């Protein structure tokens, strides 16, 4: 996809207290918890029609409206945020251990596609939630 302007909705989810969690648990346990969190995030984002843009440490960034707009991308992103919060809260290993901060923002971005991976890269003020 050549570089083009798109109206998209961005979802960010970030684990609060991850530094303290890392200090209180064995690194392998932290990796296992984060792996479960990432798996839930990836599943929920896909189920709601979003594209996982990247994992950034303990944060997840997803884009709704790429490669194609649905007309209700903001609603899809909000539904994904609520579903992710519910998935983490009800996971027997994560519930009560991982708390999330989330932000959802809609705006215009410049979008490009990485030819090798097919992943989308977005840049613009909407990304700065």
Placement of each model-derived feature along the sequence:
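Catalytic core of nucleotidyl cyclases, primarily class III adenylyl/guanylyl cyclases
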Residues: 7, 12-16, 44-76, 87-127
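Hydrophobic alpha-helical membrane-association signature
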Residues: 30-37, 77-80, 84, 125-129
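Intrinsically disordered or compositionally simple regulatory linkers and C-terminal tails
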Residues: 1-7
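Conserved long alpha-helical elements within nucleotide-processing catalytic cores of c-di-GMP signaling
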Residues: 19-42, 53-54
């Amino acid at each position: 996809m050549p570089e083009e302007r798109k109206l998209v909705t961005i979802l960010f989810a970030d684990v609060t207290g991850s530094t303290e969690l890392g200090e209180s648990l064995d690194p392998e346990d932290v990796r296992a918890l984060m792996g479960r969190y990432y798996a839930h995030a990836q599943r929920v984002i896909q189920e709601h029609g979003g594209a996982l843009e990247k994992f950034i440490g303990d944060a997840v960034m997803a884009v709704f409206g790429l490669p194609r707009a649905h007309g209700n991308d903001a609603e899809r992103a909000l539904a994904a945020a609520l579903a992710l919060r519910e998935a983490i809260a009800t996971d027997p290993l994560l519930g009560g251990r991982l708390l999330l901060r989330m932000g959802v923002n809609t705006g215009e971005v410049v979008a490009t596609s990485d030819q090798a991976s097919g992943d989308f890269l977005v840049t613009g003020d909407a990304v700065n939630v």
